[in-house]
Amino acid sequence: MKSSKAFNAAVAAALVAAVALTACLMAFPQLLGGQSSAVAETYEEKVFGTGGVLSVEISVKESDWETMLANATAEEYIVCDVTVDGYTVSTAGIRCKGNSSLSSVFSSDSERYSFKVEFDHYDSSRSLYGLDKLALNDCYADATYMKEYLSYEMFRSLGIATPLCAFANIIVNGEPWGL
């Protein structure tokens, strides 16, 4: 009988310790090397929570830009500075992205590519409010520019995890590139 009570007490103590440890790790995820929710909220709010059209300005050496577009399927990063709604991340990496859409745009002799921006590609300390990558999709074969956005919003409203998204007006070296 005594051993049964001791066993129950040990199990109860272990459960209390496990709950306390779990609560601490949830409150302080950086203890395990995780990203705190404050960082996630920062880019969620500042980049994707504006409710409007983002302004994305890309500054890049013109010859590098032309080479990247001419060799889009190589998916090679080039150095650029990216400004999103007034916040600049210098020395970021940018490349054309996609698979079938990249091939289709390339073979159609169009330059309306999707881009992948890696803010930390050349310097791991760089980010956009904690965001290290940004996809700029061209909405290829979507004349409405709405399908992807509405799909993400629909899934999000159903409680399904989806990528954050927003419309963006892209400007490259001071020239409009498109929405």
Regions found by a protein language model. Give the residues of each.
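Phosphate-handling architecture centered on phosphoinositide signaling
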Residues: 2-179
